[in-house]
Each structure stands twice: as C-alpha cells, then as structure tokens.
C-alpha cells in the first residue's frame, strides 16, 4: 500500500482486483498534454506566491518537459499501478528531479481540481477543432451553392414531391444547420471558459494562492467562483456531447438523403468511387458506406450523451468516483465527430450532381400545383381553400390522363377560371423565381443566403 501516493492513512494493501478496477490510466492518458500544461501553470503560480522557490519551479518545468517528450516519443512506461495519468506523470517527475522537489508540485492542489482542469482544457481544444471542421464543411456547401443556383430539383415533404427548388437552395439548408452548430459550440465554449484549478478537493486551500494567474496562464477567461462547483461541474462535457449529438442529427439527415439520392430510384447524385465500396457477391454494387457509417455513428454519440447525463444524475456534491466515467464517451464522441466531418467534407467535394435526372424528377408529383393555387388567390381573388379544391381537381384530371400538370396543354379546358397567363406558371424555373418572401428558393434569395453564410464564416 505504501507505493500509492495516498497510502499514508492505510495499513493494509489494496487488492489487485481493486487496483485494476480503480485505474483509469488507459483512458485518461489521452490528457497527458493537458495535465503537464496544467501542472506548469500551477507551479508557476505557486512560485509567484512564494510557495515554491525559483530553482524548484525551474526543475519542475524542466522535468515535466522531459516527461512530455518521453510520452510523445513512446518511451514513457505506463503502469496501471499508477492509477491515472496524473499520478503517473507526478511519479515520473519525482524520479527525474527527486521527490523532495517533485513532491511539492501538488501543494494547494487536489486531483479533483487537477482532473477537472485537464478535462476542461481538452474540451476547449476540441471545441476549436470542431469549429474549424464545421467551417470547412460550410465552405464546401457554399461552393456547390454558387454553382447550382439554376439546377432544379424536387423538394419533398413526407418524402413525397412538394415544390421545385434549386440544389443550391437545398444544400444551403444544411449549411444553415451547421451555422447553428457553430453558434452552439461557441456558446458552450464561452460557458467552459472558467478555470477550476485551485479549487482543491472541494473547499479551496489555506495557502494564499492566485487562481486568477493560473487561469490566465492556461488561457481561461476567469476562474470558477465556487470551489465546490469547480470540482463537481461537468456541464462543459455535457454541453460538448450535446453539441456533437446535434451535429450528428444534421449530418445524419444529409447522409440519409445522399444515400437516397445516389440510389437507382433517384440518381440525383453520384458519389465518387473514392468514397464508395462494393459487394463481396454482387459485382454491380456501389455502396455509400461513408454516409451509412455516419448515420450509424449517430446512435453512438447519442449514447455517449445519455451515458454522462445518467452518470451525473443525482450525484451528491462534490467529487465522486462515478465521475471517472466521464471521459471515455467524450473522447469517443470527439474523435467520431472529427473523423466524420473530415470524410463527409471530402466526399461532398467530389459528388457529381445529375442535373437532368433532377429536372426529370420534377415532372412527377405535380410540383407546380401550389403555384397554380397561389395564382388563383392572387390574380382571381379566389379564397385559398377554394383555389386548393380547384387545383386538386386539375391534379386528378392530369393523373387520369397519366401526365403531370406541367404537361397540360390547356388548363382552361379543365376549368374556365384559368386563362393563358396561368399557363406561364407551368414552368419550373418560373416557379423557382416567383417566390418573393425572405428565405425563399428564388435565385435572388439564394444569393442573399450565400452572402449571409460567407459573412458568417469570414468572421469566425
């Protein structure tokens, strides 16, 4: 038992089963860089307060830099007996510079605030990485939007043909979803920008420390004002997990449509061979595995969010060992999100838009019906419900003839309320550009939407 850094109170040795069960080193060694960063900031603060001597600080920093180098070069020996990355680094530091100086590093600090600080630094870094990837994905969508303002396709409600739109308008809908994802991450990052370092176990310390200094060194905006909240808070992790879950809600919807649109039934897009796979038995198959995997991984990141919510539910203040389970799911979600956004962006850059197939699909499902109803209201002063009924009859007549309403030669033969001007409406491009409301599918509106998004990402 005397090998453990907390063993002074114990007379008996820990069971080997407990040592293995209690250890988190295999998971939290991911935080080695943040742990060393936090320790250097803490030691620097201790020296500024007269708690450490200058030569002790220099030795600690030099020793920690050696530990970092050993880990990065794969020379560091991880031992599960060290329990976690924090103890592993501290033990190795004491081996390098001696326990007389190495043992002073943990003055005015608990593993509780140390862990919270390391974890929060990782979360902040992850926010910034995800913001960059989302920005790049929006830029790819904008490139498609600029090219395809006149590429007409059907929109859908209930997966039934609805109204004609442009591919530009369609892809911009997803770009605006990602814009909200960015804003959500920015808000979460702002809430996470408070340092718990110096909170100690839960009640602060009797040393005259300077928490603001260590927070400043680590790049935090301020300190957590309550030490008990500082060590027990995991909102920052929940916020990131939620933000990632919403990102996957959006990307899984896009991926589902890419799967549908690349199928033989639609053939709206062609996914590059570089991002498709084949079948082990069917030679003709070209499978959209990237999209299917992202769709599947959505359940995984949802699960990680629910897991941490459940872990934190009803935990008494302040720190509890349950909270050791907070990291694995978050590490997994962050990696999953980064990998997915990178490959989704690469795939979208190379998709081929099949314009003719999209336009031909508009000739099914009577996409111009709403335009006709609006015309009757606007030009003939007919109440909308009556106009709806009249156009419904036009649709029924067209279906009886086995044609789409866009193929009708003379609307007045179906109902005399229609004149020659109404025939001008049976044109998909006219329908697209007849929309006058803000945020509509017209080219003028689409260009404004592109400007909004370009202005947004330029200011990131």
Curated annotation (Swiss-Prot):
Its main location: cytoplasm. The keyword Metal-binding does not apply. GO terms for molecular function: argininosuccinate lyase activity. It is an enzyme of class 4 (lyase). One of its GO terms (cellular component) is cytosol. It comes from Campylobacter jejuni subsp. jejuni serotype O:6 (strain 81116 / NCTC 11828). It catalyses: 2-(N(omega)-L-arginino)succinate = fumarate + L-arginine. Belongs to the lyase 1 family. Argininosuccinate lyase subfamily. Pathway: Amino-acid biosynthesis; L-arginine biosynthesis; L-arginine from L-ornithine and carbamoyl phosphate: step 3/3. GO terms for biological process: arginine biosynthetic process via ornithine; L-arginine biosynthetic process. Gene3D superfamilies: Fumarase/aspartase (C-terminal domain) (1.10.40.30), Fumarase/aspartase (Central domain) (1.20.200.10), Fumarase/aspartase (N-terminal domain) (1.10.275.10). This is Argininosuccinate lyase. It is found in: Cytoplasm. The keyword S-adenosyl-L-methionine does not apply. The gene is argH. Its EC number is 4.3.2.1. InterPro entries: Arg_succ_lyase_C (IPR029419), Argininosuccinate_lyase (IPR009049), Fumarase/histidase_N (IPR024083), Fumarate_lyase_CS (IPR020557), Fumarate_lyase_fam (IPR000362), Fumarate_lyase_N (IPR022761), L-Aspartase-like (IPR008948). Keywords: Amino-acid biosynthesis, Arginine biosynthesis, Cytoplasm, Lyase. Pfam families: ASL_C2, Lyase_1.
